[in-house]
Amino acid sequence: MKNLVVVDHPLIKHKLTIMRDKNTGPKEFRELLREITLLLAYEATRHLKCEEVEVETPITKTIGYRINDKDVVVVPILRAGLVMADGILELLPNASVGHIGIYRDPETLQAVEYYAKLPPLNDDKEVFLLDPMLATGVSSVKAIEILKENGAKKITLVALIAAPEGVEAVERKYKDVKIYVAALDERLNDHGYIIPGLGDAGDRLFRTK
């Protein structure tokens, strides 16, 4: 798992523990997901390049640094990734936003694309793919495939919780994709849920169960 970075921080551990609690309601769950994504983004964006700019302080002129966030593309996987996008956009408000919709066929267990709306992608764009739960890796692998087919070269996957099986699936297919997570959990159960995990993130976010 050489491409995996587990962001080890007391704030993340604290907030993630509250999210795992089955008694945490959807409002707090959404807020915590946004906050943790913001903290993950601090590390996941560390490789972004800065350009020198001249600024004038109240006292004198000096050289500062600026990220060209117009070269950043944020792509949540629908639907649970939507809340994560808000966290990154707080830091990079001028980033473009794309959306990818994927579901898993219950018969074949293969990922099926049902929606994709992406801004123009090229070698210079820094793409951040967002999905709270990296479980089997099927959805993430399919989303990366879609991004690459549309011209993306620099892709970073940001997830809340990952299972070893999901990380290995992504690394096996795409060795150039870095993965940032808040926690690496034990394993998947027979139904493809992460153990201990936090349940179905989409259902808990949008109260659909």
Curated annotation (Swiss-Prot):
Uracil binds at residues 194, 199-201. GO terms for biological process: UMP salvage; uracil salvage. 5-phospho-alpha-D-ribose 1-diphosphate binds at residues 79, 104, 131-139, 200. Its cofactor is Mg(2+). CDD domains: PRTases_typeI. It comes from Thermotoga petrophila (strain ATCC BAA-488 / DSM 13995 / JCM 10881 / RKU-1). This is Uracil phosphoribosyltransferase. One of its GO terms (molecular function) is magnesium ion binding. The keyword Coiled coil does not apply. Pfam families: UPRTase. InterPro entries: PRibTrfase_dom (IPR000836), PRTase-like (IPR029057), Upp_B (IPR034332), UPRTase/APRTase (IPR050054), Ura_phspho_trans (IPR005765). Belongs to the UPRTase family. It is an enzyme of class 2 (transferase). Pathway: Pyrimidine metabolism; UMP biosynthesis via salvage pathway; UMP from uracil: step 1/1.
